[in-house]
């Protein structure tokens, strides 16, 4: 995830992330049975960070949008063009400036009750957060997303995290880590007592019963126009990705049958 705007050899790189967060069960409810939901304070998108490549002194600018593409779902039988990215709706966050150098610092949240490190945290719009107050598990209605997996995907089919504006590095994320989640911070009442807490929706990695695996996609677009890698000279080789990319070097004066294995500098 991220953007490289200034690579003199390989040009620009844009990496966007698309993912579905899902409840751990259906019908879903907030907190514990018997709790009465009073209100939603905020919704936070959290992404587990594991490293980066590039110039981390330039802040990354990230923006979150809704995924409104009904074709965005996990399937072993679905094939997409390499340029595919889901259709998006309106943004549900402001543009967040991420200083990669500070992601290792401890961050406290939930009124100081919890903390995290190596985590990108993006607060989503209050209007979007308020929608989560309306969702329920009723059999009918316009907001019964918590009733079943199919109804959930119909109303909430995922979020896109796009790099916009500045940036000169790529960030590596761990999607199946508990640190990657959608946090819903809420106020609830139990036995007449008010409390604040949060619940998390994660990336579902397996399919069982009535809960289906989450869909995830990573769209990486490179523009090498005008760079040396487009038209390399006869004495030049450019490899942008590793592992998986390699070249064979052939030296006419060095025959493989005439020498043993050697390291040549």
Language model feature labels by segment:
Residues 1-265:
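Secreted, disulfide-rich extracellular signaling modules
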